[in-house]
Amino acid sequence: LNGRLLGGVVWGIWHWPLMLLVGYEYGTNYLGAPLLGLVVWCVVCFALNTLLDILYERTECIWVPAIAHGAFNAIAALPQVLVTPADTYYNVLGPMPIGLISALPMLAAAVWLTLREMKQEEKN
């Protein structure tokens, strides 16, 4: 858990310069900008990092999480390509897959899978 949490936070922080300078991910004029976006992005990265790590551990093939990461990026960009909302103020919350509301199921799955793994390790 500690490695996944640290990895997700570092991965999120890695994006911060572009988020602060050019509005990468959520734009520049959104609810709670820029602090809320930085925090939400770390939550998204923790959840995705955990799921990608589990994919790698179970398959022992780097291509599986790499393809899943690419698929997530493509899905995350799709609403931006297909829909141009008149008001981007709430982008940090949703409906984009990188919004907090959309990331909550991914976060729940990541936490549940991690807790399940921790229980299995305790039994062994």
Please state what every model-predicted region is.
Residues L48-L52, L107-A110:
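Hydrophobic/aromatic residues in alpha-helical transmembrane segments
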